Amino acid sequence: MVKNKFIKFFALFLLSLLTFSCGTINRLNDSNNNISIEQKIKRYIKLYAPIARKQMKVYKIPASVTMAQGILESGYGESTLAKKGNNHFGIKCHKGWKGKKIFHDDDKENECFRSYNNPLKSYKDHSLFLANRDRYRFLFDLNSKDYKSWAEGLKKAGYATDPEYSKKLISLIERFNLSQLD
């Protein structure tokens, strides 16, 4: 009888310990996920900010906007397009694209996106994509330090279908102080 009570007590103790531990682990994972996303974004900025600044000097596109687009479009470098195709800006193939391709579900199923050998080529193509398309031409009349007008202009020109696109870019720029790159 004492043995049965001990076994029941021990089983109840283990069950309580396990329940408490799982709750604590889940709370730790939740807070680590928030911190880890922030850290991943900061790591992305540290890694790609020099490229964005170089592109700004050549093409006059604010580095803050380029960085915010890269963070948003690539999921801070963690998206399938970024990992498998080095596409950090969600640029689709469009007419005349003769480079590498990757297919991915987006607005439609199995859409064609540009694929690059490395992220640097993605950043350069992003600059060329904006600089060489008529629908973005008006952006280059804006002050290159006016990230808000650039973000709103990208949305107006149809860069993305998300109605909150410019707000998301501006939020990233302000949250991570990306305007210091301009």
Residue ranges of predicted features:
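Catalytic cores of secreted/periplasmic lytic hydrolases that degrade extracellular macromolecules
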Residues: 2-5, 20-182
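Bacterial N-terminal signal peptides
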Residues: 10-19
